[in-house]
Amino acid sequence: VVDDNALIRTLVRLSFKRQSHVEVFEAVDGSEGLKLFHEVQPDIVLSDIMMPGEIDGLSLCKQIKASENKCPVVLISAKGQQSDIDLGMAAGADVYKVKPLSPSDLILIVENFTA
């Protein structure tokens, strides 16, 4: 999970606490997320869009999709306008979800891609 908000990262981690087959890695911004992506080679990436630094969620998504490990990317944002969703999908997102998301929503999304 890539999000600059520590509470969101904690909520995602706790959502998967009972899912023994899921290991959650956390990054605080797009740069750290991209580095972690290359180190860990995850099965799926959940990322916020609006983050500080040089790499936002849209750029992160594009870079992941351009890599050899084209894992699914779920963009999660407070921005829910159709134009925002279109930008996310154009960046290569497999799913675009608007915050807030329930733990069961997160689990269902991940299971759809990793089952």
Locate predicted features:
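Acidic catalytic/metal-coordinating carboxylates
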Residues: 29-32, 55-59
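Active-site beta3 strand of CheY-like receiver
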Residues: 40-46
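Alpha4 helix (beta4-alpha4-beta5 surface) of REC/receiver domains from two-component response regulators
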Residues: 59, 80-95, 108
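C-terminal output helix
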Residues: 101-110
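The short loop immediately C-terminal to the conserved phospho-acceptor aspartate in CheY-like receiver
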Residues: 49-52, 79
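Conserved phosphotransfer cores of two-component systems
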Residues: 38-40, 64-70, 91
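Two-component/phosphorelay signaling modules centered on CheY-like receiver
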Residues: 6-25
